[in-house]
């Protein structure tokens, strides 16, 4: 995994949760720790924490957005410029149950693909914030967030992407955005 960095999107205040999702826990581990561990398990050493507002108890750098308020693309743009490798595994902090094996399969496909981005798809749902992007997209991202709305899918369509079709159970991809989902997931774990 020498050629791949990892970006964990840990910014974005959660208005619906009323607190930072990164610091929510399942079985005593924070969502952020769970995602970091997946990266480490995959052998990735260049891990960047995008927009994390908590206290940095981690050995990885926190990268602030260069253009705040631009959503996930703003976070990615800043991180892509700091990443040490030509590819970046991008993972939101709010999908803590995604198995490392699925990410490994996603990485394998992206390293053999000509597409500039390969995102995970399950049961017809495309997940742009679970993907492998080429870091050379940083300038195109800058253009997207400064000249246009900074919409992730519009950006992907413009630059070309393909999907890795996951056969894993949909539950693994639960996006934990509100207290009800969190209670359900934490309770079932």
Segment roles from a protein language model:
Residues 1-149, 157-173, 180:
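Nucleotide and nucleotide-moiety/phosphate-recognizing core
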Residues 189:
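ER/Golgi luminal nucleotide-sugar-dependent glycosyltransferases, focusing on the catalytic module
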